[in-house]
Amino acid sequence: MDRLKLYFSVFVLSFFIVSVSSSDVNDGDDLVIRQVVGGAEPQVLTSEDHFSLFKRKFGKVYASNEEHDYRFSVFKANLRRARRHQKLDPSATHGVTQFSDLTRSEFRKKHLGVRSGFKLPKDANKAPILPTENLPEDFDWRDHGAVTPVKNQGSCGSCWSFSATGALEGANFLATGKLVSLSEQQLVDCDHECDPEEADSCDSGCNGGLMNSAFEYTLKTGGLMKEEDYPYTGKDGKTCKLDKSKIVASVSNFSVISIDEEQIAANLVKNGPLAVAINAGYMQTYIGGVSCPYICTRRLNHGVLLVGYGAAGYAPARFKEKPYWIIKNSWGETWGENGFYKICKGRNICGVDSMVSTVAATVSTTAH
């Protein structure tokens, strides 16, 4: 087996960048980083080696030599970016992901999709203050059967629809005792709900949307169909194919939670998984661990699902272990920790506490 094949066999399980001093790399030189291989000593690979491994793992094929060379240049820039992220976010592991041949603008357009805007739809409530004295130290809705398997939005800015359906899936589970995968494509095709004060800021399929607007649409239209009855295509549909006789989950009400982590945790435990917006700047290079960057903007651009929290997930140098949130993403199981992301609690890192919503479900009378 040649050297690349040998490295690739372990690359699938473990591929990440460890810290390298900035003096090691000049922008004009080939990037050399270290790769941890199967628990052995780190192996030194060039950027060409990494790109070959990347193409094999993710099945990347480019239409021309020009496209190949361009993607290689983008890939090298993203290796440098991952190295910077590793320094700024040392409690997580950053490296090569399926997005490593995308520019930042391509990544934002294809894989994010939360629109800016904080105005509440007319039917939204402000969540009541809940008691927080007896919250469990650790909690995870995956352990209680309220979370469907990780999905994949593909190259479509529909993250908002996955965040909204995930919250309603959990709420419907609490209301009915049944976990049913709901249709994101229904929201992509049929939901054109607009911000109440910005008529041109509407849910717009692969071009973005808001979870609260999706809840407003779902409340008005009667609910959502099953995923299997209205399957996801990852494209904007030309027509809405809603069949109201096949609605299986309905919204009774939805609320916005204050920027208070104890209240967020209390609502999570009581009401099920929560729809959350976040800044995804560090997520393009995230491999695993608890992300707690020293610097991260709170400009929200990605919709995710908050499913749990832990009391002690990482320990900065000379400090005791710190708590973290557990987030379900919509980029497939090959990304992150089997499709999940951990981010530290305590400082509204990357805006994770800024736009949090809870939804309650009723049993649809037309459910099949």
From Swiss-Prot:
The active site is at residues 159, 302, 329. Interacts with the Ralstonia solanacearum type III effector PopP2. GO terms for molecular function: cysteine-type endopeptidase activity. Its main location: other. It is an enzyme of class 3 (hydrolase). It comes from Arabidopsis thaliana (Mouse-ear cress). Its EC number is 3.4.22.-. This is Cysteine protease RD19A. GO terms for biological process: defense response to bacterium; proteolysis; response to osmotic stress; response to salt stress. The gene is RD19A. Residues 23-134 form a propeptide. Gene3D superfamilies: Cysteine proteinases.
